[in-house]
């Protein structure tokens, strides 16, 4: 994400130093069991858990109508591919201003959370912080509507309601669409 801001040479240096520092700090935790358990956890995260997932639930519903196969088993790789392509697109498109970097991080994280299989309410905190430095308010709406996800918890289990998810995500998507459309309209009028 820092490529346009720092340039190729400084970016490579920055990432090498960052990875090197984390690798050194990580040495005390190195063990075969750690890697085995960590990879198992990541595998579970992307291929077993489902909670408060907007786009994923919609795709799952469409897939159930068409062929009935389980989408969750392939969702991990789909999320990685989509977020990687989105990041590459934004890196190429972005200007070299710091405000643009924060906006790009906001778009990458938002895209990830929109297609993720699991979105707990506290995940949006980073988006909320980033949105303070942009003109976009859809994250603020999302932070208000996310409280509805707690309706899925009852005394013994977690059971999500489609109507609650629709009620939760419709205002967010409408606000995002309105903001994107109005900002595009402003750019067209300014030209």
Show the residue positions of the predicted features.
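Aromatic/glycine/proline-enriched transmembrane-helix motif characteristic
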Residues: 44-118
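Aromatic-enriched
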Residues: 136-191
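Transmembrane-lumen/periplasm boundary regions of multi-pass, lipid-linked membrane glycan transferases
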Residues: 20-45, 58, 126
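Membrane-interface catalytic loops of GT-C/OST-like multi-pass glycosylation enzymes that act
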Residues: 116-127, 156-162
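Central hydrophobic cores of alpha-helical transmembrane segments
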Residues: 14-19, 103-109, 128-129, 139-150
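Perimembrane helix-loop-helix junctions
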Residues: 1-20
């Amino acid at each position: 994400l820092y490529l346009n801001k720092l340039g190729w040479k400084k970016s490579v240096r920055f990432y090498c130093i960052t990875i090197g520092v984390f690798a050194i700090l990580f040495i005390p935790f190195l063990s075969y069991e750690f890697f085995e358990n960590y990879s198992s956890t990541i595998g579970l995260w992307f291929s077993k858990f489902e909670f408060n997932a907007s786009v994923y639930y919609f795709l799952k519903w469409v897939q159930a109508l068409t062929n009935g196969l389980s989408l969750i088993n392939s969702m991990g790789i789909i999320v990685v591919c989509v977020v990687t392509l989105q990041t590459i697109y934004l890196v190429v498109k972005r200007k070299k201003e710091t405000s643009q970097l924060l906006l790009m991080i906001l778009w990458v994280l938002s895209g990830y959370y929109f297609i993720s299989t699991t979105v707990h309410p506290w995940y949006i905190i980073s988006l909320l912080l980033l949105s303070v430095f942009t003109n976009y308010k859809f994250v603020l709406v999302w932070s208000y509507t996310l409280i509805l996800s707690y309706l899925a918890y009852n005394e013994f289990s977690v059971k999500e309601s489609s109507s609650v998810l629709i009620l939760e995500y419709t205002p967010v998507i409408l606000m995002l669409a309105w903001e994107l459309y109005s900002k595009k309209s402003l750019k067209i009028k300014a030209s």
